[in-house]
Amino acid sequence: MNKLNEPTPRRNFLTNSVKGTLTLGVGMSTLASLLQSFTFAEDEDSGLLLQGAGAVTTEAQFRAAVAGPVNTSMMSSQLAVAQATNPYAKQFAGFELEETKGMISILKDLGTTPPPPDAKAQAMMTQMKAATGAAFDKAYITAQLQTHQLLQTLTQGYLASPAPAKTNMMEMHGRHIATLALATIKEHVAITQRLSTVVGS
């Protein structure tokens, strides 16, 4: 039996923990306007950079900022589970798909609906759908590396902002979850960096 797409105890724990803590006291927020406050640019060395990441200071802003990249990662991983030919790329896609499904479920429970794919995400998906074999694997891993670099920038920016009062449990829980997420994001950056040297060659 293929166990790539089976949920692991770590993923179940993270999903249930986030839902059980962050749903306390969450109300509707102006997430659409928050999303519009962020713009993206290309950097020659590190790929995607977020302009305005330092403005992410609350858990609501953080949720709004990561929703798009997480959704893009989920869509590309859905495609890669079916089309990837490199076994390591396919395995990574299976793990990433389950993690992003869990995160999207959490975001929706908290009132954060991922925005429609932007022009860059649409172009990436179009490129992937047109590719086959090793070219597809390379396009997928490259996209995953850039997406996780972006998520790392967002998460580190949020955690570097002034800490909330310890009595503000909603914000404290948000930072706890971001801290856990950052470790996984860094792990995925390292994995995709290694994979980028072997896929498509």
Segments the model singles out, each with a brief description of its role:
Residues 1-15, 19-36:
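N-terminal secretory signal peptides
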